[in-house]
Amino acid sequence: MLAIIPSLALATEFKTPAITPERVAALQGTPEAMLVVDVRGAGEYKSGHVPGAVNIPHTKLTERLDQLRQAKGVVLYCIIGDRTLLAEQTLLESGLGNVYHLDGGLMGWRKAGLEVRTGWGP
């Protein structure tokens, strides 16, 4: 139980603005669409992810900064927010702007009743 409490506490200290699952879903397929990044491991991504999301584990973000800089904006998510917080810190320290976090993470996406895809493709 103690291991969960610090993780949840971290998830509330985001430095980036939150964006709701409904807003992300509404922007998908439009010119205003942002790059949605699942920062979990590959196995977790395969078991369920936001449609259109790319999988870049938080430990690999610096290797993909060029791709991330080309996006209109970047929306980060994990299951509840702990790895999103680490990813956010990495991107902000790298000078990347227009970074957002998905409000509620993948759990929030599911709670909103939005589609979750499985497998490797976005």
What role is predicted for each listed range?
Residues Y77-C78:
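Metallo-beta-lactamase
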